[in-house]
């Protein structure tokens, strides 16, 4: 619920910004003003209606209609929804789903598969292809960091604020712990995104039962899986500009949406 709240507010802010830009541009051409699809105020009102639901728990929405949320391993809290609709003596099962995650992603659990449905409605951007073999992200990233830092450069990683940023921190922590980058062991790591910073806080505050076995094992040992030594947070525009003044080879994770 918390992640949905910050993303919905951020999306509303973008809607307002784009509507304002279109109106400034359209005013000169005499175009009719446009309104954002929804505003930050609308997002705030919607957030007050959110109710958290446990995975795997079948709930009654109305007489004859039941639902169950199933973990799909895409993002923290992501779910497919099973819906049972009973009319008379006949029950029909519908499944609604967005993206379904890959196996063995860090931090979050693998997707739970649904075995049966009468009708399925789902996102299908990559529905016609198989995933390539999963690379060793830690080893590959360490090679990139080593090669770039040795030349005095910076590694800039465009990352979605939710999911990818936290995965990147997970990999960077492991790289530093194992000393995989020689001669630059204390290199700084920047998160250059207010939304990613807030999402990372929510990940840290989440019940460990939401994470996969490897992440829970780290937490039981007192290890924060996304706490990278040398991590620096950029929240304001001034913070972002200050990154340019740091001449030390560094890793920067940023998202252009905030």
Stretch-by-stretch model annotation:
Residues 2, 57-60, 196-198, 240-242:
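A short acidic, often aromatic-flanked loop/helix-cap motif at beta-alpha or helix-coil junctions
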Residues 3, 163-164, 184-205:
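Short, conserved secondary-structure transition motifs
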Residues 217-236:
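Long, charged amphipathic helices and adjacent flexible linkers at domain junctions
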């Amino acid at each position: 619920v918390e992640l949905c709240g910050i993303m919905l507010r951020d999306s509303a802010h973008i809607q307002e910004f784009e509507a304002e830009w279109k109106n400034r541009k359209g005013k000169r051409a005499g175009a009719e003003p446009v309104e954002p699809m929804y505003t930050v105020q609308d997002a705030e009102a919607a957030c007050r209606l959110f109710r958290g639901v446990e995975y795997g728990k079948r709930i009654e929405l109305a007489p004859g209609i039941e639902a169950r949320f199933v973990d799909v391993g895409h993002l923290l809290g992501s779910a497919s929804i099973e819906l049972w609709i009973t009319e008379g003596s006949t029950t029909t099962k519908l499944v609604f789903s967005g993206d379904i995650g890959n196996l063995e992603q860090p931090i979050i659990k693998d997707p739970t598969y649904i075995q049966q449905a009468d009708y399925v409605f789902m996102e299908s951007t990559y529905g016609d292809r198989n995933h390539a073999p999963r690379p060793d992200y830690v080893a590959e990233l360490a090679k990139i960091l080593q090669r770039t830092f040795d030349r005095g450069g910076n590694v800039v990683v465009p990352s979605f604020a939710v999911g990818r940023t936290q995965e990147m921190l997970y990999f960077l922590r492991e790289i530093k712990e194992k000393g995989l980058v020689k001669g630059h062991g204390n290199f700084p790591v920047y998160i250059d995104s207010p939304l990613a910073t807030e999402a990372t806080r929510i990940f840290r505050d989440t019940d460990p039962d939401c994470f996969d076995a490897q992440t829970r094992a780290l937490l039981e040992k007192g290890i924060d899986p996304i706490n990278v030594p040398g991590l620096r947070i950029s929240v304001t525009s001034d913070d972002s500009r200050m990154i340019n003044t740091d001449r030390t080879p560094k890793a920067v994770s940023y998202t252009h949406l905030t």
